[in-house]
């Protein structure tokens, strides 16, 4: 089986499934044996497996970018394929699959839109039905029952048969090409794009962008994994693997730590807290992530950590900003992104902001790649 691993599903006890560009493999921790499935010896619909999902019956659903969807029945030990055709999938370039609690399978595809499989029948939802784009890259369930779709036209929420988009122009995403969407334990949304990462609070719409503009990642962000202590483990294509501590400080994980791959697709924790990392060079298993955190945080961070202060907040006649980068641009906007004022910090990264003429209410102070909520009172 090939070394390029795109996804992994971990089971209690150490067994797991792996999606690769050469098929699908299963590791049985009890027997300590591997079993691989391909088109030739397993009857898969394709070879380039992208994502995996387990349904309530224990069946494995696999998305293939070169064919469609294959479903494995562990009792029968056989695969069932869903390909392209009338009443089937619209295209074979499937990018993701997820099965909800009711057993409905949701499938995203590149150029074919969104598809759902229920009661042994496929239904396709495309631009003609209001989908902003037919080129989708992934699917993530929301806590409110909605579906979030990664796409070439931003992050798309599908709820109640309606679509709502988060985009670069309106919602200040780093890029409209969204590769993945994840939710942290605190409910924050992590939007992975081709030019960086946005962390967004969906309740307040406050956000922070991490990308080329603040020196972090200048290329493709694939995935974010969250550990129990608030640290984030960021997988990047061409840029490798990063640790983002709960304090927001970044460390590059590289050859010093024994990590050599440049293309990292995703990472997942098992029930023991061990981290399995899918890369272009196989699976790397980090048995004790805490020890690596301790080692990295005892060294200089990859990027400086800036502490920015906005006070007073709430404010009436003025507020002051401290801790920004020297001569950083500051914009005062409405919550909808309408620009009200544009200013510049001094050489020390400080700025006094007069609020004369600003109607009492809630606004955003956008400083570089970060947005801070400012409450203007009477």
Regions inferred by a protein language model and the residue ranges of each:
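Carboxylate-rich, polar loop motifs that coordinate divalent cations or form catalytic acidic clusters
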Residues: 1-302
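C-terminal outer-membrane/trafficking sorting elements
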Residues: 303-311, 315-378
